[in-house]
Amino acid sequence: TNANVYVIVNEGEVFQIDSGLKSSFNAIRKFYSENSLRPNYVLITHAHVDHIGALAEVYRYYKPKIFAHGLDLKVIRGEERMPNRSFLMRLFGAFIKAEPVREADEIINKNFKNIEVIETPGHTPGSVSYLYNDGKERYLFVGDAAFERKGKLFVNRTFSLDLKTAEESLNKIIGLKPVTILPGHGNPVKLEQ
């Protein structure tokens, strides 16, 4: 299914988290048009097609700076395929592909005001989360490092490449409370202290 796409307006700059499937682009463009915005940056949580499928369209239309973890960059750039543990992922990947975006760059050691990059591998080798602090609340955009169902967070065992590392990343995420978790699929989950 399609992934959630988030937008942060931070210090006058627009940060988009992930891009969803290619079919998401019209909704993304409509959102920006209706809100008189355009993305300065696209921060990718990981390189699965449901999170990067519309990335090439977003890049062509808006020319934002694109960042992802180095371990997933070769997939985004079209230089490698994402390894797949499950038959479902191989099947999904055979039918739905993302157009390469060669302009993507490494996120690690990149500094953005109020946004911290947190490595949360396991779902993919280069999975990262983005912790945004607006001065009042903390929000963690986790991609697929945590899935939400009925208000609970869990690791998706079918689509995660390294289950042990994914569980460790989920524990790291939970350890960041108080924070509102914004997953790639499902609804936000507020973790109290």
Predicted ranges, named:
Residues 15-17, 43, 66, 139-141, ...:
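Residue-level marker for buried hydrophobic side chains located in beta-strands
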Residues 22, 72-119, 125-192:
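Metallo-beta-lactamase
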